[in-house]
Amino acid sequence: MKILTGGVVAIASFTALSSPVYALPQANVDTVAQHLMGIMDTSAQAQQISEVPSVRMTTCEVTVEGANERFLYQEQALIRNLNQPYRQRFLRLSLSNDGEMVESRTYEPENPETWISLCEQPREERIIERDRITDANCSVYLVPWHNLYIGHTQPGGCPADFRGATQVTNTIVLHGAGMNTWDRGFNAQGEQVWGAESRPYQFRGQDG
């Protein structure tokens, strides 16, 4: 299957998000969760392009006490240093308030180092107390488009304090082989300080 890249995905994203709207079935939340769960990495892309870092993304389902929505835990780390992830977060998946998109809402963990390798624990032990995670005021909204899901961060991006960035934006494409992501950080002057430029990061599914 050919995966959308570069400017093509921008056109596809605009088309998908500006198409006539309709209420999505709840099953779309489960489909997005299945796309995200498991292990993906950028090792194949990094072997071809030297400036692309080799990164692993690990995502698993968790239970948040008192929550009716579906929650995932996700961490990203350089493959050479998996025990020191540079990004850890919980994702709440639900339909958006208008029912027309799937919303992935980010929550930040209390004491992130205590959650490292959470996905290696048995499913029944991955139970999270609600007061140990904090709403990060950041959402990605996804819509189905053919056999893909395409998503963007909320208008204006998300607040950040990471590697010189005060704002982050992302466009993601979920597909059968994994995920393409245009993850970018911008400083207070609106200048990009890290992240994807001419090409997306290409995360591809691994057997685990």
Predicted regions and their residues:
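Glycine- and aromatic-enriched membrane insertion/assembly motifs of diderm outer-membrane
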Residues: 71-73
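Bacterial N-terminal signal peptides
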Residues: 7-16
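Boundary at the C-terminal end of the N-terminal hydrophobic targeting segment
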Residues: 18-25
